[in-house]
C-alpha cells in the first residue's frame, strides 16, 4: 500500500484563492438590505417609551383656538390676496397638527387629489407620515402635486419619528437617537456649517426642532421646501436671497406688490438671541427633564410654556423668582406688540395708498421703488411677528427688525405722497372700516360665507374618506 504524504501548507495555499473568491463573490451578489420603513403611528412606541408618549399625548390639552385675525384685523389687509387673510389661528398642541391643517380655511375645500389652492409641501411639518413618504417615494415623489393628494396618506400627528430614529436599536433601548427626518432640513444645516452628524448633543436638540420651527419657501415647479439661508440667517440676508431669485409668495391684491410671507422662524430668532448664543436649547426650556411616579427622570414631551415648569426650566439658570421673570417677559412682549401695531398701521395705509396710485394710472416703473419698500417693510415685520416667542427668544432683534420695517414703510408712504401729487391727488387716502375681522375681509372682497360653507362640506365629506382609506391601508390605528 502506497502512503501519500500530505503537504498541509501546500493545500492551504491552494485553497486561499478559493476562499477569497467565494467571499468576494458572496459580498457582490448579496441582496441589498431593505430599508426599514418609517413607522408613523406614534402609539407603536408607547410600550417602549410610556412616559414620553403620555406626555406627548397630553399636548391634546392645549386645545384652545385663538383667532389672530379677530385680535388684529389689520392682518387681513396686509395679507390681502393670500389664504392667510381668510384664517390665521395661533399655534396649539402638536396633537392637533393634522386636524388644524385640514380644517383651516387656508387649505381650501378640494374635491379631489388634483384640486385646491396649496401644494403637497403644506403637509411637511405636520406628521411623521411625511418622513415615511419621503423615504418611500423620494423628495420629488413626495412634493409632487396638490395638498389634497396627501390626505389619505398623512394622517398621524407630529410625533416620534419626526425627531427620533425610531428604527434604531438604541431607540429601542430607551436612548433618544435624534435625527433630521427631513432631508431638506439636513441640507440647510450643512449650508450654514452645521452638519447634523458632526453636531454636539445640544446643537442637535435645537436642530431637530429647527426642521419645522423655521422660515422656508416653496422652490421650483415642484414646490419643494427650501430654507432661504444661502446668504445667511438674518432678516436682511434672507431678504437679499429672495430678491436675488425674484421670489414672492403672492401679490397683494390691493397694492399689487410681490410679497413675502414669513412662516415660523423660531430657529433663526433663537439663534440671534441670548439663549441661542449660550446654547440654551429648545429642549432646556420647552421639554425639561421631569420625574414620573416612580421618581425616574424623563423628557417631558408636553411642549409648552417654560413658566409652566419653572423649577425645571428657568430656575436652572436664573436666580430671580417666577413673578419677577414673568414681569420682564411681559414688558418685552408689550414693547414688541406696541411697535408691531405701529408698523401695521403704516403698512395698511401704504397698501391702500398704492392702490390709489395704481387706480390713478401710476406706471410699473413708478411703482417699483414703492413696492420694493412695501415688500421689504412687511417682510421684516412678518419675520418678527411670525416668531411667536420672539419676546423671549430675541427681543432686541425683534425690536430691531420692527424698527427697520417702520423706516421702510415710512419711505414707501413718502414716495407715494409724491407720486399721488403728480396724479393730482393731494388729499388723504381714506381707509375703509377694518375695525373687525369681518369688516376687513369684506373690504378686500372675500366672500367668507361661501368659503366657510365649502370648507364645512369638505370636512364632512372628504376627510372621512381620507381616514377610511388610511385605515384600510394600515396607516391609521382602528
From Swiss-Prot:
Signal peptide annotation: 1-26
SUPFAM superfamilies, A to Z: Multiheme cytochromes
Gene3D superfamilies linked to this entry: Butyryl-CoA Dehydrogenase, subunit A, domain 3, Flavocytochrome C3, Chain A
UniProt cofactor(s): Ca(2+); heme c
Annotated Ca(2+) binding sites: 215-216, 261, 263
UniProt catalytic activity: 6 Fe(III)-[cytochrome c] + NH4(+) + 2 H2O = 6 Fe(II)-[cytochrome c] + nitrite + 8 H(+)
UniProt xrefs under Pfam families: Cytochrom_C552
Record text on cofactor binding: Binds 1 Ca(2+) ion per monomer.
Residues binding heme c 5, per UniProt: 275, 314, 317-318
Ligand binding (heme c 2): 160, 163-164, 301
GO cellular component, one term: outer membrane-bounded periplasmic space
Statement: the UniProt record of this protein carries the keyword Electron transport: yes
Metabolic or biological pathway: Nitrogen metabolism; nitrate reduction (assimilation)
Residue positions binding heme c 4: 282, 285-286, 393
InterPro entries in the record: Cyt_c552, Cyt_c_NO2Rdtase_formate-dep, Multihaem_cyt_sf
Main localization, broad class: periplasm
Keyword annotations from UniProtKB, A to Z: Calcium, Electron transport, Heme, Iron, Metal-binding, Oxidoreductase, Periplasm, Signal, Transport
Induction conditions: Full induction attained in the presence of nitrite. Subject to glucose and nitrate repression.
Residues binding substrate: 216, 264
UniProt superkingdom: Bacteria
Enzyme superclass (EC): oxidoreductase
GO terms of biological process kind: anaerobic electron transport chain; nitrate assimilation
Subunit field text: Homodimer. Component of a membrane-associated heterooligomeric complex.
Role this protein plays: Catalyzes the reduction of nitrite to ammonia, consuming six electrons in the process. Has very low activity toward hydroxylamine. Has even lower activity toward sulfite. Sulfite reductase activity is maximal at neutral pH.
Classification via NCBIfam families: cyto_c552_HCOOH, PRK11125.1
Annotated protein name in UniProt: Cytochrome c-552
Organism: Escherichia coli (strain K12)
Gene name in the database record: nrfA
Amino acid at each position: 500500500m502506497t502512503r501519500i504524504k500530505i503537504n498541509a501548507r501546500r493545500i492551504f495555499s491552494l485553497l486561499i484563492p478559493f476562499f477569497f473568491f467565494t467571499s468576494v463573490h458572496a459580498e457582490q451578489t448579496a441582496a441589498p438590505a431593505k430599508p426599514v420603513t418609517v413607522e408613523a403611528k406614534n402609539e407603536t412606541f408607547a410600550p417602549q417609551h410610556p412616559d414620553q408618549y403620555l406626555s406627548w399625548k397630553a399636548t391634546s390639552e392645549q386645545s384652545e383656538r385663538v383667532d389672530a385675525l379677530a385680535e388684529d384685523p389689520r392682518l387681513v389687509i396686509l395679507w390681502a390676496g393670500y389664504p392667510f387673510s381668510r384664517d390665521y389661528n395661533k399655534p396649539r398642541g402638536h396633537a392637533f397638527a393634522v386636524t388644524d391643517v385640514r380644517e383651516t380655511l387656508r387649505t381650501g375645500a378640494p374635491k379631489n387629489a388634483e384640486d385646491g389652492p396649496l401644494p403637497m409641501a403644506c403637509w411637511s411639518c405636520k406628521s411623521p407620515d411625511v418622513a415615511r413618504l419621503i423615504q418611500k417615494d423620494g423628495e420629488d415623489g413626495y412634493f409632487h402635486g396638490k395638498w389634497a393628494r396627501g390626505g389619505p396618506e398623512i394622517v398621524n400627528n407630529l410625533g416620534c419619528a419626526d425627531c427620533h430614529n425610531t428604527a434604531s436599536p438604541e431607540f429601542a433601548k430607551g436612548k433618544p437617537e435624534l435625527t433630521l427626518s427631513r432631508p431638506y432640513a439636513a441640507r440647510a444645516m450643512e449650508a450654514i456649517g452645521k452638519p447634523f452628524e458632526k453636531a454636539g448633543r445640544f446643537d442637535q436638540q435645537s436642530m431637530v426642532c429647527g426642521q419645522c420651527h423655521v422660515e422656508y419657501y416653496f422652490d421650483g415647479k415642484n414646490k419643494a421646501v427650501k430654507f432661504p439661508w444661502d446668504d445667511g440667517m438674518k432678516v436682511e440676508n434672507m431678504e437679499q436671497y429672495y430678491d436675488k431669485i425674484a421670489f414672492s409668495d403672492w401679490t397683494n391684491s390691493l397694492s399689487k406688490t410681490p410679497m413675502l410671507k414669513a412662516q415660523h422662524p423660531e430657529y433663526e430668532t433663537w439663534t440671534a438671541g441670548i439663549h441661542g448664543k449660550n446654547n440654551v436649547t429648545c429642549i432646556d426650556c420647552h421639554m425639561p427633564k421631569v420625574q414620573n411616579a416612580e421618581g425616574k427622570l424623563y423628557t417631558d414631551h408636553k411642549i409648552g410654556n417654560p413658566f409652566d415648569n419653572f423649577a425645571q426650566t428657568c430656575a436652572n439658570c436664573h436666580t430671580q423668582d417666577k413673578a419677577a421673570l414673568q414681569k420682564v417677559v411681559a414688558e418685552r412682549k408689550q414693547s414688541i406688540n406696541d411697535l408691531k401695531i405701529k408698523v401695521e398701521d403704516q403698512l395698511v395705509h401704504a397698501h391702500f395708498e398704492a392702490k390709489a396710485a395704481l387706480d390713478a394710472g401710476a406706471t410699473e416703473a413708478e411703482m417699483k421703488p414703492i413696492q420694493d419698500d412695501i415688500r421689504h417693510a412687511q417682510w421684516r415685520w412678518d419675520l418678527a411677528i411670525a416668531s411667536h416667542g420672539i419676546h423671549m427668544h430675541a427681543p432686541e432683534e425683534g425690536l430691531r427688525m420692527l424698527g427697520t420695517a417702520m423706516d421702510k414703510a415710512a419711505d414707501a408712504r413718502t414716495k407715494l405722497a409724491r407720486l399721488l401729487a403728480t396724479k393730482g391727488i393731494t388729499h388723504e387716502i381714506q381707509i375703509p372700516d377694518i375695525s373687525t375681522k369681518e369688516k376687513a375681509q369684506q373690504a378686500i372682497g372675500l366672500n367668507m360665507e361661501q368659503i366657510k360653507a365649502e370648507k364645512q362640506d369638505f370636512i364632512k365629506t372628504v376627510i372621512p374618506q381620507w381616514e377610511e382609506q388610511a385605515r384600510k391601508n394600515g396607516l391609521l390605528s382602528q
